[in-house]
């Protein structure tokens, strides 16, 4: 109990606690105690001024703290002899005036903001200078490495963001509205003007969004049983797999899982996801979730193409060539959980992703759905990414399953099955048409973006003999 660690002074005025260093405050169960004084490395709590009954508290209830320091103080039981023999250094330290951290004034904050924007401007100028050399390197016929390609892409995006930012510079007194505009549109400024606090806030918001999306996907993906038919034997392997995972609950082999995953191509998967699931995927991938269903599918396909090119570049150069920030960004862009994981664990997760994508040829949309499906679970729920992938396939919508069966090259589908599948597709088309009619502006924007051609990113200048042929296109 606390009374075993505290002792009364000769004048019976209070209690003392031996400290490892001078403290500037005391709290008991998060309640500050204002009546205390320092005495040769000890604290004297005057119970005449602060009516606190110590007998009902445990030692963990009392916290001594020091403003500006996170040092933990010792709670050894003092004796009167130790108090008398206290070192002179401790007494000298206690006589020093305590420094109180003051909040910066308005002028200091304005000055700090101006310096931050000035440093960001100089940093942007250096990036433009570096990127101009990379453009010249491309013009003479050399290929860029992954790091150089990402540097050039980031600089081009920052230059594009300067167009709306220049309005606040040209229009008189428009800079007064800049903080409000940045608050409403966080991506308005180039990346060089973003401070560490804003980056951490965005990461925390993305983690929160991904947890919500993961829970929503698990609740919306249907878990009902498929209707299996034994009329043909060409797709027996495909049907046996889903009978195992959804009817009998058996675990298929990894070879069966790989073969079945290859049937779920990216276009088929995206075309048979509902709007709620498409919006959830866009939010999970940190994309714009506004627009028609075709626009959402286009955004997801475009991001997946970028990830596939990046996969090939990392596979050629090796995971060990990535720095720690690049490793975190690579895992984060693929929907892999990064919070609380060591760099060694992240390298393992990224290596599994590359093996699934490059070596085994599993479609990227199914892998992203698998990451989103398992993101909300605690670490250790799945033994491996393969188990999460199996659960994802066991929860796919019925429309996606039926469309995949029809799309199989060796599958002979009866007219009755074709009629049912066509009705399902007709319902999806009608829902999309209704949404386009309600939002004509979004449909026009989607048409314009489809006409725009995306620039192919450059990969490293290395032999691609280790990449399968289906991944070189």
Curated annotation (Swiss-Prot):
One of the GO biological process terms: mitochondrial translation
Transit peptide per record: 1-73
Stretches in topological domain Mitochondrial matrix: 183-473
Keyword Mitochondrion belongs to the record: yes
Membrane topology reported for the UniProt record: Single-pass membrane protein
Major localisation: mitochondrion
Regions of compositional bias (Polar residues) in chain numbering: 462-473
Record-annotated Letm1 RBD domain positions: 205-398
Entry GO terms, CC: matrix side of mitochondrial inner membrane; mitochondrial inner membrane; mitochondrion
Region annotation (Disordered) ranges: 430-473
Functional summary from the UniProt entry: Involved in mitochondrial potassium homeostasis through the mitochondrial K(+)/H(+) exchange regulation.
Protein name per its UniProtKB record: LETM1 domain-containing protein mdm28, mitochondrial
Protein species of origin: Schizosaccharomyces pombe (strain 972 / ATCC 24843) (Fission yeast)
Originating gene: mdm28
